[in-house]
């Protein structure tokens, strides 16, 4: 089984995407600026993806739309989704976790801790995939 090493980073602000790309420079990265583009990139690269880093508030399609798509199509168990958003209301947090998000990370964030949290959960998903195969 090939090791997945590609992140899909989805945020409408280029600066946020660049900061996360720089943080995860040891991995391949695919970027998307809205939810619709995220779904297109996800479908194209789903067998390579180790995680999706997903903003909530975006034009065209928001992050919840992407998360719902992943749940509907059965992808949520294979690829961890991290919500990275300034919207940390109880309603948004509940919705994210209810839909199967692996973690919710509030903006602004400490990049060192975000890297550690994301890498730890990616490793757990990798181990789970390995045990299932």
Predicted regions and their residues:
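Two-component/phosphorelay signaling modules centered on CheY-like receiver
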Residues: 14-31
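Receiver (REC) domain active-site loop signature in two-component systems and cognate sites
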Residues: 58
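Acidic, metal-coordinating helix/loop segments flanking the phosphotransfer/catalytic sites
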Residues: 31-51
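His-Asp phosphorelay/catalytic-motif detector in bacterial-type signaling
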Residues: 47-50, 74-80
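C-terminal output helix
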Residues: 91, 109-118
């Amino acid at each position: 089984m090939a090791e997945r090493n590609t992140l899909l980073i989805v945020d409408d602000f280029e600066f946020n995407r660049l900061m996360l790309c720089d943080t995860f420079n040891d991995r391949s990265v695919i970027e998307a600026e809205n939810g619709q583009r995220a779904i297109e990139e996800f479908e194209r690269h789903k067998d390579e993806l180790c995680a999706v880093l997903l903003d909530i508030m975006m034009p065209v399609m928001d992050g919840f739309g992407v998360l719902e798509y992943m749940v509907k199509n059965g992808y949520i168990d294979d690829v961890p989704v991290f919500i990275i958003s300034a919207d940390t209301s109880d309603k948004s947090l509940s919705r994210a976790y209810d839909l199967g998000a692996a973690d919710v990370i509030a903006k602004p964030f400490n990049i060192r801790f975000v890297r550690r949290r994301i890498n730890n959960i990616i490793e757990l998903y990798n181990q789970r995939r390995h045990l299932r195969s």
